[in-house]
Swiss-Prot record:
Taxon lineage: Eukaryota, Metazoa, Ecdysozoa, Arthropoda, Hexapoda
Site (Reactive bond): V233, A234
Keywords attached to this entry: Calcium, Disulfide bond, Glycoprotein, Heparan sulfate, Metal-binding, Protease inhibitor, Proteoglycan, Repeat, Secreted, Serine protease inhibitor, Signal
Record domain Kazal-like: where: 222-273
Composition skew (Low complexity), residue ranges: 144-159, 301-340, 620-629
Tissues in which the UniProt entry reports expression: In the wing disk, detected throughout the disk where it is localized primarily to the apical surface but is also present at the basal surface (at protein level).
Record note on quaternary structure: Interacts (in heparan sulfate-bound form) with wg.
Entry GO terms, CC: extracellular space
Primary site of residence: secreted
Disulfide feature: C228-C258, C231-C251, C240-C272, C536-C555, C566-C573, C575-C594
Source organism of the structure: Drosophila melanogaster (Fruit fly)
Subcellular location: Secreted
Protein name, as recorded: Proteoglycan Cow
């Protein structure tokens, strides 16, 4: 018994030791929390980002693509960005990579407008159905109120009168409230047409009727609502009404007319506005502009005709005056004064012709100097003049040529025959006229070949030429005959006659006009060039006799130069084109192979025309000077 306290203390110590061991083992066996990331560091920002990204995966933003929008013009988007519209009023530069990454939806502006139109039509349909339900609910409330008033017990006569007065006021308030509801409904449905005069009178009569009539009005409203049948759910076929509003189907249009007591008809199929109406208005505007333009043109033509008539009268008067002067010269009266008057009359005539040529001119004929196979020619380039040009009225001054000042005065010999009419070619000798005819024929052939090489197809002349007419003359006649009437007028020959480098062209052309009617027909034109020669034949005719040791060109049947030309006395040969222009580095003793040289020159000239590089020191044409060795 003495050892009992010791035993108790030992037991207590054992119990404490065992409990401590058990606690340590439990602490060792307890698992450590590693978290969602497997024991790694956790960041709150990353978790939030992951959650936000998971939420955004299900949402795809819609963008509107409209390259022609005015909102995108001030934005300077980068190369890898594109301008898109968030809505109708805001534009943003969006990265293409982000669009692909987020899988955003991009729609066109037309699709967006179509969806908006469908949404508005659906809203309008829902509003119509809601209006019909509201009207039905109001009618049910009115009928319930009327039934309760009729079933209420009646007392004295005063009480009945007061009840009837209250019913009248209630009915008036209800009718007014119904009228207000109808007006608000009309605004919600975008109903723009005004109420017909008959409907207004009916409403006023209904409001002015005594209290005994509400039951009749309610019955009429119920009958109208029963007649307005709602539309079933079906695939929409959009229609544009006469009120410029879009309806989803014909049933919706009828339902709208039934509710609002209107008679709106179908304007066209599809969304409003109708294209036919827009096109019709556009055609009306265009027709109005055309009418104004035609009136202006007719006035201008009338003024031009009046001016032409006045000029013709002036020309006829000038001819009469010239004839009178000739008679006076024949009688021997005041010889010197008559000569001066005749010169002034001729100058006035040429000035009037020049002015007449430029009144109705639709083109200006600008001389352009070109080179063809080492030879200079003048080619008439047709260019349209500008309407607002300050030189429009006096276009002949643009050529720096004043015919009145530079033209020499014609001097008549006192001993000459007074009965003879002064010749138009008095300033040029017959030899000069023959030479200018040969040069013109050679020039016509060059222009014809150049136009064929350039593949410029001129209009075929409908005029009839004599059988013996030369090809160059026929081609040039069709080239100058702009209106294709078979006659060359003063206007069409103006630039050809008034060449400042060739003063004998106009006298030569004047000799062609045999009937002196100020125009040249095909017969006169061909006869004028009948006695002219082509370049080689012209040189041989000019040489006249065969001098000892003189060079005589070798011509073909048509009168052009043969490719190979030889000087027999010297023993030298060279190659030329058909106009007599010598090819460089071809002069040799013996006969060279001129056909290959001509073919190579033709290909080179076509390349030179494309590059615009020509030799400025080339020799002139064969008809301009005689070859002397």
């Amino acid at each position: 018994m003495k050892h009992s306290p010791l035993i108790a203390s030992a037991c207590l110590a054992l119990v404490l030791m065992s409990s401590s061991l058990i606690g340590s083992t439990e602490a060792r066996n307890k698992k450590k929390y590693v978290g969602e990331t497997g024991g790694d560091f956790e960041f709150i920002d990353e978790i939030n980002k992951n959650t936000q990204s998971n939420k955004n995966l299900g949402e795809h933003k819609r963008w509107i693509h409209d390259p022609s929008s005015d909102l995108c013009r001030p934005l300077n988007c980068k190369k890898r960005e594109i301008c898109l519209l968030e809505d109708e009023f805001s534009a943003v530069c969006v990265s293409k990579k982000e669009l692909h990454k987020n899988r955003d939806e991009i729609i066109t502006k037309a699709k967006y407008l179509e969806e908006e139109a469908k949404r508005r039509v659906n809203q309008q349909d829902n509003q119509d159905s809601q209006d019909a339900e509201d009207i039905n609910n109001d009618d049910e409330d009115n009928s319930s109120d009327g039934g309760s008033s009729n079933s209420s017990p009646t007392g004295t006569n005063n009480a009945q009168a007061s009840v009837q007065g209250n019913e009248e006021t209630d009915d008036e308030d209800k009718s007014l409230s119904l009228g207000d509801d109808d007006e608000s409904k009309e605004d919600d449905v975008f109903y723009e047409n005004s109420i017909a005069a008959g409907d207004k009178q009916q409403q006023q009569q209904q409001l002015s009727q005594p209290a005994a009539g509400p039951s009749v009005i309610q019955q009429d409203d119920d009958e109208e609502l029963d007649n307005c049948k709602p539309c079933p759910v079906a695939k929409p076929t959009f229609l544009c009404g006469a009120d410029n509003r879009t309806y989803s189907s014909l049933c919706r249009l009828d339902y709208h007319n039934c509710i609002h007591s209107t008679s709106i008809r179908i304007a066209c199929k599809g969304f409003c506005p109708c294209k036919e109406i827009v096109d019709g208005k556009r055609l009306q505007r265009i027709s109005g502009y055309n009418n104004k333009y035609n009136k202006k043109i007719s006035l201008d033509q009338q003024q031009q005709q009046q001016q032409q008539q006045q000029q013709q009268q002036q020309q006829q008067q000038a001819y009469k005056d010239s004839n009178n002067n000739n008679i006076m010269m024949n009688s021997g009266n005041i010889m010197g004064g008559n000569n001066n008057d005749f010169n002034t009359i001729m100058n006035d005539k040429e000035d009037n012709n020049r002015h007449n040529n430029h009144i109705n001119a639709q083109y200006t004929f600008t001389p352009e100097e070109i080179k063809y196979d080492n030879k200079h020619y003048k080619y008439l380039k047709y260019t349209a003049y500008k309407k607002d040009s300050k030189y429009q009225e006096d276009k002949h001054k643009m050529r720096n040529y004043n015919e009145v000042v530079e033209k020499q005065q014609q001097k008549f010999n006192k001993n000459s025959n007074l009965n003879a009419y002064p010749s138009k070619s008095a300033e040029c000798k017959p030899q000069q006229l023959t030479a200018i005819g040969n040069r013109l024929l050679d020039w016509f052939s060059v222009i014809m070949a150049d136009s064929k090489k350039r593949r410029q197809h001129s209009q075929k002349s409908k005029a009839h030429f004599p059988p013996a007419c030369k090809t160059e003359a026929k081609w040039m006649f069709g080239h100058l005959d702009l209106n294709n009437d078979g006659q060359l007028s003063l206007q069409e020959m103006y630039d050809l006659e008034h060449d400042q480098n060739e003063r004998c062209i106009k006298p030569f052309i004047d000799t062609c006009d045999l009937d002196t009617d100020s125009s040249i027909n095909t017969r006169e034109w061909c006869r004028c060039f009948e006695k002219t020669d082509r370049p080689c034949a012209a040189v041989r005719r000019r040489i006249a006799g065969d001098f000892a040791g003189a060079y005589a060109p070798d011509c073909d049947i048509q009168g052009f130069y043969k490719p190979t030309q030889c000087h027999n006395s010297v023993g030298v040969c060279w190659c030329v084109d058909k106009h007599g222009v010598e090819f460089a580095n071809t002069r040799t003793r013996g006969k060279p192979n001129c056909e290959s040289v001509v073919n190579n020159a033709a290909s080179l000239t076509s390349d030179d025309e494309d590059e615009g590089a020509d030799d400025e020191d080339s020799a002139e044409g064969s008809a301009d000077q005689m070859l002397v060795f």
